[in-house]
């Protein structure tokens, strides 16, 4: 099975893990600081806090911003954690529709802010598939209305926007180190920022809100959590980060092949990355034309049967039964249509061009046999 994404674990990772496992300290040690420093250097920020998941990172980012009982404006086209973490932090969530590239529509965001901005606690955007949002426009809106901006860059480590690394431009930015993401620490995440005060608050909450006066004496000054990432996981993260740019080049080779082969086909469109952006290529989404919406499940199953691991990114968050109970029925046209159209096909550094050609040939072969049928 050629999976839609895949971790890259080689002997250097195994060696790094083995060495870390032999250390006296397995958690709360020097490797945590080293990983945070490496992330800061790579992304181009001053401060970082690594945690046990991106969900934890989101939760503490929202909490540090003090968004309780306020509204978080976010995208529905994301993993549920983007909104869930805001609710856990005591906020309300409101979804803004997307554009045809899967990213939040900055014009619709502006229209919502013009309507009323006094109750907004944060704007939380997602760089879908590794393709940066229009950060200039969104950042300007956040500054104009004096609203904190969170960039959920879980897909986008290594991505760039106008020459700057994604993760260096918002008040707080989030990264994920789940195995399908650009680098992995098994599970893990991080918050990065140039705001020392916010990161200090997040680091305090990461470990129970406890500060140590002396080795044997501590004080709990906040109600915190156990969201720590182990030294063993950080050792893997440090080594993974060293390989990231090389792995992104390999992903780009696969996507360049797809872009060329899929141009002007009769079945689907692809997402074009603008010249002033660089994507991590976490995902390679294809967007079926409307006449194939009804056949998407058939296509999905046929591809799996052929050994091609596909996935759908994402069911809009407001479509989950929990959110229907919470918010009622919501219809956002672009997000609805994107969900009907989207399939993520294999694209990762473990593939070669032979694999990509197999995916392309199989995809077209199956689509040729699928009957068109408009289904709304």
UniProtKB/Swiss-Prot annotation:
GO terms, biological process: polysaccharide biosynthetic process
Gene Ontology MF term list: pyridoxal phosphate binding; transaminase activity
Organism expressing this protein natively: Campylobacter jejuni subsp. jejuni serotype O:23/36 (strain 81-176)
Known catalytic reactions: UDP-4-amino-4,6-dideoxy-N-acetyl-beta-L-altrosamine + 2-oxoglutarate = UDP-2-acetamido-2,6-dideoxy-beta-L-arabino-hex-4-ulose + L-glutamate
Family the UniProt entry places it in: Belongs to the DegT/DnrJ/EryC1 family.
Transmembrane segments: none
Protein name as annotated: UDP-4-amino-4,6-dideoxy-N-acetyl-beta-L-altrosamine transaminase
Top-tier EC class: transferase
Known function: Catalyzes the second step in the biosynthesis of pseudaminic acid, a sialic-acid-like sugar that is used to modify flagellin. Uses UDP-2-acetamido-2,6-dideoxy-beta-L-arabino-4-hexulose as substrate producing UDP-4-amino-4,6-dideoxy-beta-L-AltNAc.
InterPro entries: DegT/StrS_aminotransferase (IPR000653), PseC (IPR020026), PyrdxlP-dep_Trfase (IPR015424), PyrdxlP-dep_Trfase_major (IPR015421), PyrdxlP-dep_Trfase_small (IPR015422)
Binding-site positions, substrate: 4, 24-27, 54, 176, 226, 311-314
E.C. no: 2.6.1.92
Lineage, uppermost ranks: Bacteria, Pseudomonadati, Campylobacterota, Epsilonproteobacteria, Campylobacterales
Entry annotated with the keyword Ion transport: no
Keywords (A to Z) from UniProt: Aminotransferase, Pyridoxal phosphate, Transferase
Domain of life: Bacteria
Positions bearing N6-(pyridoxal phosphate)lysine: 181
């Amino acid at each position: 099975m050629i999976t839609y994404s895949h971790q890259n674990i080689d002997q250097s990772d195994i060696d790094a893990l083995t060495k870390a496992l032999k250390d006296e300290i397995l958690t709360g040690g020097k490797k945590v600081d080293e990983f945070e420093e490496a992330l800061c250097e790579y992304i181009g920020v001053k401060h970082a806090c690594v945690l046990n998941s991106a969900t934890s990172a989101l939760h503490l980012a929202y909490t540090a911003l003090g968004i309780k009982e306020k509204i978080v404006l976010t995208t529905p086209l994301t993993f549920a954690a983007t909104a869930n973490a805001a609710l856990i932090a005591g906020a309300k969530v409101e979804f803004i529709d997307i554009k045809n590239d899967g990213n939040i529509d900055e014009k619709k965001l502006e229209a919502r802010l013009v309507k009323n901005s006094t109750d907004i606690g944060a704007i939380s955007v997602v760089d879908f598939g590794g393709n940066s949002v229009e950060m200039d426009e969104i950042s300007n809106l956040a500054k104009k209305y004096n609203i904190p901006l969170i960039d959920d860059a879980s897909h986008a480590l290594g991505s760039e926007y106008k020459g700057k690394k994604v993760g260096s431009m918002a008040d707080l930015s989030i990264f994920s180190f789940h195995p399908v993401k650009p680098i992995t620490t098994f599970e893990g995440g991080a918050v990065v920022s140039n705001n020392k005060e916010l990161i200090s608050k997040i680091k305090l909450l990461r470990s129970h809100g406890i500060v140590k006066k002396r080795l044997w004496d501590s004080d709990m000054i906040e109600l915190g959590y156990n969201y720590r990432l182990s030294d063993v996981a950080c050792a893997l993260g440090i080594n993974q980060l060293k390989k990231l740019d090389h792995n992104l080049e390999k992903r780009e080779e696969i996507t360049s092949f797809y872009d060329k082969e899929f141009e002007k086909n009769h079945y689907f469109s692809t997402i074009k990355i603008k010249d002033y952006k660089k994507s991590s290529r976490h995902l390679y989404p294809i967007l079926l034309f409307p006449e194939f919406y009804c056949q998407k499940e058939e296509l999905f199953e046929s591809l799996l049967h052929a050994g091609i691991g596909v996935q759908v990114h994402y069911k809009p968050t407001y479509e989950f039964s929990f959110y229907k109970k919470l918010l009622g029925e919501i219809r956002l046209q672009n997000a609805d249509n994107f969900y009907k159209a989207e399939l993520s096909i294999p694209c990762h550094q473990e593939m070669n061009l032979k694999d990509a050609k197999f995916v392309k040939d199989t995809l077209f072969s199956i689509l040729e046999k699928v009957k068109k049928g408009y289904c709304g």
